[in-house]
């Protein structure tokens, strides 16, 4: 199994102003991330606007990412959803083109029970020989996977870990304490990622890494080796970035930030809209404060 740890960018999906996919910019972003030390690419997750890409686009985004990365760092394909059958099919495709793992979000809208979540994720893991990272983000899905359900799933072959995005450090500590050593716990919440990693977490699936790949790599490396002072310093440097990349729904602010940095165009798909004018200077100031924009 490929080692997956450190700063894992929840990469955006670049789009032209008309909303069409911008593959040249995606390839350029990937190369920039690798040069800046990013430890893994998570493609077509929340930050990648997975709900508004078609099935064909979803597949092509995974294929192009795997091709561009070319085995330099791990690729984690966002292939989850609220249909178990579709999640299995998309995960099988990701495996066929060479992804290293899949990210499986808690099924949203249909609000499964804890048993339903368990059976859903077990079905995906048993159907496709590709490591599964669970993704718990109740702020998006409404349904919240319990620690007990995560621990049950940790016993399922093929389930390698979880992206825990609640930001609840007490919950993360309980999970880290009780989980087997083979089960990896990743933060999915930039403001609390340092704390989770200092408790024994294995990395951070990060929005901030989109704009600060080198800093996030250094932060994760420091936290995971127990270098509290370095991790604290970088965290404080990025504090306003962590906060202000969520002044509107992710990935609205981070896509605007990348456009301001000259990394891509600012296209985004409805029902998401471009960053409101009153927040643009807030985000710009955060980037400048962190030394990411002159």
Swiss-Prot record:
Protein name (Swiss-Prot/TrEMBL): 4-hydroxy-tetrahydrodipicolinate synthase
Has keyword Cell division? no
Residue ranges spanning the membrane: these are none
Q: Which pathway does the UniProt entry assign to this protein?
A: Amino-acid biosynthesis; L-lysine biosynthesis via DAP pathway; (S)-tetrahydrodipicolinate from L-aspartate: step 3/4
**Which PROSITE patterns does this one have?**
DHDPS_2 (PS00666)
The organism named in the record is Ralstonia nicotianae (strain ATCC BAA-1114 / GMI1000) (Ralstonia solanacearum)
Q: Does the keyword Cytoplasm apply?
A: yes
Q: Where is this site: Part of a proton relay during catalysis?
A: 46, 109
Query: Which EC number applies?
Result: 4.3.3.7
Give GO terms for biological process: diaminopimelate biosynthetic process; lysine biosynthetic process via diaminopimelate
**Subcellular compartments:** Cytoplasm
User: Which Pfam families does the UniProt record give?
Assistant: DHDPS (PF00701)
